[in-house]
């Protein structure tokens, strides 16, 4: 096996750099939209191994990415904890907001076992994936998952969760610890089922001040990493604290993750400094893929020029948007791999 992504995570420089995209199995692909219709609901798609395998493999068949990422959602963890969860068109995920008292009644024992369909998807994907393609599992970071559990939906600045944390510090700390423990079990099961590496998505870390970032983002992720490595000491783990800004510095060392996922707001000069301490992943603005043309080419070239001589997995700085034209995705891949656009 020649798993380029794993080599980079381990600190090697691979040229051209391996490439995959967050949300690469998604609505920009016509084949995904067809499979999504068959599934009925979004959650049914996540929990139906045959269909989840199909959408996981679709971008690999079409583009030959160097990594496949398990098709699922970060909110299957609170769903397994017994929280009601539904996805509505145009509204995204919706849940009944959890209150402080309910947190003390959350039962975490055996919760990860309720996600067996996800592990079956991992097993089936690994069987069908080309040997040279890395299979990534993932979970949401406790802070980001907690924001949805508290507000009941996504909010622009996660004010409900921040206010909850200030008002109910004990309950909030318990929620983060519970989510960290269940998420660690969840990742352990994914690794056992055949995932080559895992990514922890902290999509809302950028709304916190420095003290809260340390307590709500770094400590819970470090707890996950420690628990995963107690079972799989060599586990390769990617951390993606989107929007962390200057607080990216020290994140790898404090949490124990191997590779840093960078969002598109991270200056390339700062990204290059972060790369000196280990592998980085990112960080093209997803809207450059929507725009195409010179905007896309210039964005790709700038990243390759600044970081291509070190350990880099080329990716977007967040998930690809449904509006992205397929031909622009191919143009990006060709440019990264040195072909003509």
From Swiss-Prot:
Keyword Oxidoreductase (UniProt): no
GO biological process: protoporphyrinogen IX biosynthetic process from glutamate
Pathway: Porphyrin-containing compound metabolism; protoporphyrin-IX biosynthesis; coproporphyrinogen-III from 5-aminolevulinate: step 4/4
Positions that bind substrate: 23-27, 42, 73, 148, 203, 318
Molecular function, one GO term: uroporphyrinogen decarboxylase activity
InterPro entries attached to this UniProt entry: UROD/MetE-like_sf (IPR038071), Uroporphyrinogen_deCO2ase_HemE (IPR006361), Uroporphyrinogen_deCOase (IPR000257)
PANTHER family found in the cross-reference section: METHYLTETRAHYDROFOLATE:HOMOCYSTEINE METHYLTRANSFERASE RELATED, UROPORPHYRINOGEN DECARBOXYLASE
Reaction(s) catalysed (UniProt annotation): uroporphyrinogen III + 4 H(+) = coproporphyrinogen III + 4 CO2
PROSITE patterns: UROD_1, UROD_2
Keyword Plastid: no
Chief subcellular location: cytoplasm
Protein name: Uroporphyrinogen decarboxylase
Pfam families, alphabetized: URO-D
Enzyme class: lyase
Record's function text: Catalyzes the decarboxylation of four acetate groups of uroporphyrinogen-III to yield coproporphyrinogen-III.
Chain positions of site Transition state stabilizer: 73
Subunit-structure text: Homodimer.
EC number(s) on file: 4.1.1.37
Gene Ontology cellular component annotations, sorted alphabetically: cytosol
Listed SUPFAM superfamilies: UROD/MetE-like
């Amino acid at each position: 096996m020649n798993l380029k992504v794993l080599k980079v995570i381990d600190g090697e420089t691979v040229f051209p750099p391996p490439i995959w995209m967050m949300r690469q199995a998604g609505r920009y692909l016509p084949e995904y939209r067809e499979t999504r219709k068959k599934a009925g609901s979004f959650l049914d798609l996540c929990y139906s191994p045959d269909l989840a395998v199909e959408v996981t493999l679709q971008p690999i068949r079409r583009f030959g990415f160097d990594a496949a990422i398990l098709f699922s959602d970060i909110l299957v963890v609170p769903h397994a904890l017994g929280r009601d969860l539904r996805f509505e068109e145009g509204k995204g995920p919706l849940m009944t907001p959890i209150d402080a008292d309910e947190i003390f009644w959350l039962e975490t024992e055996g919760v990860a076992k309720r996600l067996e369909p996800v592990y079956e998807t991992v097993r089936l994907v690994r069987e069908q994936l080309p040997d040279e393609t890395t299979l990534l599992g993932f979970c949401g970071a406790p802070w980001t998952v907690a924001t949805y559990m508290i507000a009941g939906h996504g909010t622009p600045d996660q004010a409900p969760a921040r206010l909850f944390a200030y008002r109910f510090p004990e309950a909030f700390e318990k929620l983060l610890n519970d989510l960290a423990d269940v998420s660690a079990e969840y990742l352990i099961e994914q690794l056992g089922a055949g995932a080559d590496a895992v990514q922890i998505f902290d999509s809302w870390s950028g709304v916190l001040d420095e003290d809260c970032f340390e307590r709500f983002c770094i400590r819970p992720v470090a707890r996950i990493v420690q628990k995963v490595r107690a079972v799989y000491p060599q586990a390769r783990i990617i951390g993606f604290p989107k929007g962390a800004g200057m607080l990216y510095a020290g994140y790898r060392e404090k949490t124990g993750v191997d590779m840093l996922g960078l969002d598109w707001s991270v200056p390339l000069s700062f990204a290059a400094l972060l790369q000196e301490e280990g592998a980085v992943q990112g960080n093209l603005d997803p809207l450059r893929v929507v725009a195409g043309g010179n905007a896309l080419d210039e964005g790709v070239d700038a990243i390759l020029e600044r970081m291509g001589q070190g350990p880099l997995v080329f990716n977007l700085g967040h998930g690809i948007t449904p509006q992205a034209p397929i031909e622009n995705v191919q143009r990006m891949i060709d440019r990264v791999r040195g072909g003509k656009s």
